[in-house]
Amino acid sequence: MGYLDDEVKRLQGIISNIEGRVQALESRQLGGNQKKTAEEIRMILIGPPGAGKGTQAPKIKEKFNCCHLATGDMLRSQVAKKTTLGREAKKIMDAGGLVSDDIVIGMIKEELDNNKECKGGFILDGFPRTVPQAEGLDKMLRERSQSLQHAVELKIDDQLLVSRITGRLVHPASGRSYHTTFNPPKVHMTDDITGEPLIQRSDDNAEALKKRLATYHKQTAPVVDYYRKTGIWQAIDAAQAPGQVWKSLQAIFDGDKAKAKKAGSGLLSKLTPSS
């Protein structure tokens, strides 16, 4: 048994050295001595307007130090910066057309490549809205040797949404959202973080919302089915208080950590002799 014990220790040492070299290479890949975070998130938030994506996304961003890519905001930013893709998108929008999936996916890829916040992963909000978009996103991520971890759907009854949205307040620059009744800002009509003014969107009224919800349900059902088949879809009851929704999200993330810990210890456990 002495020989076997020595051999196990020798192999464990080799594995430990390999793990150290992998971490060093990952650090160099990130550019310098920055250590790659053990926690990284790659997820999509699915949910109708008013489900709470704008409330939960900043919390996820803070937890993982990742980027929040709300496609509408990203599109406006690219147009304002006059990037190549932004100029192309503006030309299409000025002509009354819809920006192509390839352009939007190109913008997401550009953010993942160049936005330092995306080193900790990303939250996609507002995309994909169709199955071809979901397939295009998966293809782009595969080319980066990545894949989505979660497609989390915030589910809520339409009637409750109407009451939620008609009192919604938004901080345009960040996408943070508040509610006059359910989640009011600390100072009236003022963003808690920046102190900048909040707005109420012109389409946040009952009739406009019902039309938006009908469109949302028609578009989103096939996308939800797509991610359900891949095994990464999970649903959360968004009718709960925001704090409870956050606890449900944390339970999903804690499940990731448990899986990673189990996978990481798998090889060493095989080399460790049973008592």
From Swiss-Prot:
Binding site for ATP: 50-55, 168, 177-178, 240
The UniProt record lists the keyword Cytoplasm: yes
The protein, known as: Adenylate kinase
Domain notes: Consists of three domains, a large central CORE domain and two small peripheral domains, NMPbind and LID, which undergo movements during catalysis. The LID domain closes over the site of phosphoryl transfer upon ATP binding. Assembling and dissambling the active center during each catalytic cycle provides an effective means to prevent ATP hydrolysis.
Biological process annotations from GO: ADP biosynthetic process; AMP metabolic process; ATP metabolic process; DNA replication initiation; pre-replicative complex assembly
EC number: 2.7.4.3
Region (NMP): 70-99
Enzyme class: transferase
Stored PROSITE patterns: ADENYLATE_KINASE
HAMAP family to which the protein is assigned, alphabetical: Adenylate_kinase_Adk, Adenylate_kinase_AK2
Protein's cellular compartments: Cytoplasm, Cytosol; Mitochondrion intermembrane space
Subunit structure of this chain's protein: Monomer.
Domain of life: Eukaryota
Protein function: Catalyzes the reversible transfer of the terminal phosphate group between ATP and AMP. Plays an important role in cellular energy homeostasis and in adenine nucleotide metabolism. Adenylate kinase activity is critical for regulation of the phosphate utilization and the AMP de novo biosynthesis pathways.
MF annotations from Gene Ontology: adenylate kinase activity; AMP binding; ATP binding; DNA replication origin binding
